[in-house]
Swiss-Prot record:
Its main location: membrane. Coiled coil: none annotated. It is found in: Endomembrane system; Endoplasmic reticulum membrane; Cell membrane. SUPFAM superfamilies: Family A G protein-coupled receptor-like. PANTHER family: HISTAMINE RECEPTOR-RELATED G-PROTEIN COUPLED RECEPTOR (PTHR24249), TRACE AMINE-ASSOCIATED RECEPTOR 1 (PTHR24249:SF415). This is Trace amine-associated receptor 1.
């Protein structure tokens, strides 16, 4: 059993920010949480309610929205208190549960993005065999992997304390005794978490986007040339627009993902090698940038998918409670 020195003083370590600053932070973070919850809840309701949206691809989007909604519901509120107060008030056991759930849901959201990019790859680059390859069974396997792998990794690592092997004393002095609660990794576990939760799925997304962009560009150029030869220049715009739109949608999803999560994961993997010099406040701030990814995902749908905008109107105006509204045509 370890003892915390000067525990009488440390036990009251909390935020040095003024009441006004803390109130502003609570308001800002509450807005982020509310945006995450409402946006993803609308995606969940829309895909669940409208029969036209019951496609394999949309069930993958539905699953990711559930992950992001749970992140906003189960993780972000407690992270908000930790961030603003600079202290963890909810006990050691709940800290482990919160950290495990945080890692699991954040990783699951990222894995869903990787699988969505694979789905888009086949849709754009192999359209003739798309429905045969990306069927309901394939989507079910993707969803199963996206949930189970992060769950086993996160809960196994945190509750077995595999992330603390070799750095137990450092964790006790720098986190536990200061009433902190945030993911703390040794060099080995940090690299493993970085590879599993960020590098591998991120590399898949970048590779797939690279392939989609150049294949779609080549297809559009070929169609352009063929139509020009028969004097149908104007008709080349429709397929080009469709392919370009698919590439742009995935490109924005990948860009938002990298912008949100890159800073956090690079600090996380480098910190053990730098002697844990990165301040917890900075880590916490970067973690919130990562959370923003879950709030931005529904905004990408709203911008690029007309069906989402139509479904949003029907949900907001209560039209989903009308008879046979589930059979409404959201697209042709």
């Amino acid at each position: 059993m370890h003892l915390c020195h000067n525990s009488a003083n440390i036990s009251h370590t909390n935020s040095n920010w003024s009441r006004d600053v803390r109130a502003s932070l609570y308001s800002l973070i509450s807005l982020i949480i509310l945006t995450t919850l409402v946006g993803n809840l609308i995606v969940i309701i829309s895909i669940s309610h409208f029969k036209q949206l019951h496609t394999p691809t949309n069930w993958l989007l539905h699953s990711m929205a559930v992950v992001d909604f749970l992140l906003g519901c189960l993780v972000m509120p407690y992270s908000m208190v930790r961030t603003v107060e600079h202290c963890w008030y909810f006990g050691e056991l709940f800290c482990k549960l919160h950290t495990s759930t945080d890692i699991m849901l954040s990783s699951a959201s990222i894995l869903h993005l990787a699988f969505i990019s694979i789905d888009r790859y086949y849709a754009v680059c192999d359209p003739l065999r798309y429905k045969a390859k990306i069927n309901l069974a394939a989507i079910f396997v993707m969803i199963l992997i996206s949930w189970s792998l992060p769950a086993v990794f996160a809960f196994g690592m945190i509750f077995l304390e595999l992330n603390l092997e070799g750095v137990e004393e450092l964790y006790h002095n720098q986190v536990f005794c200061l009433r902190g609660c945030f993911p703390f990794f040794s060099k080995v576990s940090g690299v493993l978490a970085f590879m599993t939760s960020f590098y591998i799925p991120g590399s898949v997304m970048l590779f797939v986007y690279y392939r989609i962009y150049f294949i779609a560009k080549g297809q559009a150029r070929s169609i352009n040339r063929a139509n020009l030869q028969v004097g149908l220049e104007g008709e080349s715009r429709a397929p080009q627009s469709k392919e370009t739109k698919a590439a742009k949608t995935l490109g924005i999803m990948v860009g938002v993902f990298l912008l949100c999560w890159c800073p956090f994961f690079f600090c996380m993997v480098l910190d053990p090698f730098l002697g844990y010099v990165i301040p917890p406040t900075l880590n916490d701030t970067l973690n919130w940038f990562g959370y923003l990814n879950s709030a931005f995902n529904p905004m990408v749908y709203a911008f690029f998918y007309p069906w989402f905008r139509r479904a949003l109107k029907m949900v907001l105006f209560g039209k989903i409670f009308q008879k046979d509204s589930s059979r409404s045509k959201l697209f042709l």
